[in-house]
Amino acid sequence: MTDNLTRAFKELLNQERFGSQNEIVDALKKQGFTGINQSKISRMLSKFGAVRTRNTKMEMVYCLPNELSVPNTSSPLKNLVLDVDHNSMLIVIKTTPGAAQLIARLLDSIGKSEGILGTIAGDDTIFVTPTNDKPIAELLQNIQRLFENAL
């Protein structure tokens, strides 16, 4: 197994959107890997301890255990953020496991000038409270733009 294949395989699983082994086979083939079949994917899933779990959309998908996919400061932000939602009072950001505090720290550093009063972060969820002078829709757009353009 090549390092490139291993890296691509792990990146696909970290996206948390592949529900079948055949979907993983197809995605790797689209990336140019040859000799990939369902049995090889099955062995790789076992080797890396992948499990099937529900993603934020409640779909059953393959993913790596938390300790293998711990985010770091060089991880692209858009890969760490799974969903951004809001109501009239606050914004809720869903992240990959372990990434919430890293992203909350970034948002706190942006601070009041961008309309962020403060954040509360757990393991994979962040609550963002806007300042009174910034409409929540505008803050939501700023946050989404930040994640789209980051790294």
Swiss-Prot record:
One Pfam family for this entry, by name?
A: Arg_repressor_C
- Kindly state which keywords UniProt assigns to this record, in alphabetical order: Amino-acid biosynthesis, Arginine biosynthesis, Cytoplasm, DNA-binding, Repressor, Transcription, Transcription regulation
Asked whether the keyword DNA-binding is assigned, the reply is yes
Q: Does the keyword Ribonucleoprotein apply?
A: no
Q: What Gene3D superfamilies does the annotation carry?
A: 3.30.1360.40, Winged helix-like DNA-binding domain superfamily/Winged helix DNA-binding domain (1.10.10.10)
Which InterPro entries did the record assign? Arg_repress, Arg_repress_C, Arg_repress_C_sf, Arg_repress_DNA-bd, WH-like_DNA-bd_sf, WH_DNA-bd_sf
Q: In which pathway does it act?
A: Amino-acid biosynthesis; L-arginine biosynthesis [regulation]
Q: Which GO terms describe its cellular component?
A: cytoplasm
The Gene Ontology terms for molecular function here are: arginine binding; DNA binding; DNA-binding transcription factor activity
Q: Known SUPFAM superfamilies for this protein?
A: C-terminal domain of arginine repressor, Winged helix' DNA-binding domain
Compartments in which it is found: Cytoplasm
A biological process (GO) of this protein is:
protein complex oligomerization
| Purpose of the protein | Regulates arginine biosynthesis genes.
Similarity remark: Belongs to the ArgR family.
> Cross-referenced NCBIfam families, in alphabetical order?
argR_whole, PRK05066.1
- Protein name per the record: Arginine repressor
Query: What is the originating organism of this protein?
Result: Haemophilus influenzae (strain 86-028NP)
Gene name of the encoded protein? argR
